[in-house]
Amino acid sequence: NYSAKRKADSPFIGKTAYTWRMSEFKVSADNPNQADRSSERILLEFDWVNRKHNGGGLAFGPDGFLYVGVGDGGGVHGVPDIYVPPKTDTNDPNRHAEEIPEDPFSIPEQFHKYDLYAQDTKKLNGKILRIDVDHGHPGYAIPPTNIFRGKSEGRDEIYAWGFRNPFRLSFDRAGNGDFFVSGVAESFWETVYLIDRQGNYGWSIREGTHCYVRSRAFNPPKKCATHGSLGEKILSPIIEYPNWSVMRKESTVKAKPLGTANVGGFVYRGKALPSLYGKFVFGDFSSEIIRAIVCGYPHKHMAGTMERQ
C-alpha cells in the first residue's frame, strides 16, 4: 500500500518461524510499481503464536498516522504447529494431519488461552495499532492521544482492541472520515465495525453482539460480560450477519446464513453509481452478493443488496 509520500508498508511473516514483522520499503527507482528490497526499514516485529490471523489491514488515517490491524495470532483456529499430541510418534511426518483436529469448534482445551490475547492490552495481538511512521526513526513515534500512551494498563501503540483478525481497514476519504474495520467470524457472526472511538470491540468475550465461549460455541450463552477488564464498555459492530456454520446440525443458533467470510469494503465516492454514493460497499467470500449499508452509527441493517454482475 502506497501513501501519498510514495512509501510502502507491508506486514508479513518473516523468515524466522512465528515472527510478525512490519516493514517499510521505498519505491524502486527503476520501477514505480515495485519496492526496493534493499531499502527495508523494520518498523515493528515481535514473537507470533501461529501462521494464521496475522491481520494485515493497513491504512493512513486523515490524521496522517498509520493504522495497523493485527490479528489474535490464530493460536486456536488451527492449532499451532508446535503442538504434538500425547502418545504420538514424533518421527511421523503426517502426525499433525492425523491427530490434530481441523475443526475450530473442537480444539484441545490447553489452547483456549490464545482466545484471551485480543483482550490483553499488554499484548499487540488482536488490536488496531496507531503509530507515527514519519517520526521516531528507525522505528516509529506514538501519537499523543493513543489511549494507553504512558500508562501501565496497556501498550502505547494500541488504538482499539478486541479483534479476531482485522485484515481489512478503510477510511472514508470524504464526509467525516469514518474508519471501518471488517472481521471474519470464528464461529457464526461476520462483522463490520465503525471505529468511532478508542476502546474494546469485544472479541473473544463476544463475537459481534453475541456472547462467545469456545467450549460451547454451538450453544453460546445468552448473557456475558458487557465490560472489559479495565471497566470499559464493550463496543458493538455496525453490522453483523450469520455465516454457514449456523446450518451445522450441532448449532442452536437459528438464523439464515448470508455468506461464509466478510472480505471487507470501502465507502463508495465514485460517480458511476449514484445510488451507492456514501454507502459502505462490501463483499463476502462465497455468497456472490455485494452489499451496501448506510454509513453512520449505530445502523445495523443492510441498506440494500446487489447481485453480482
Protein language model features and the residues they cover:
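A well-ordered secondary-structure block
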Residues: 42-45
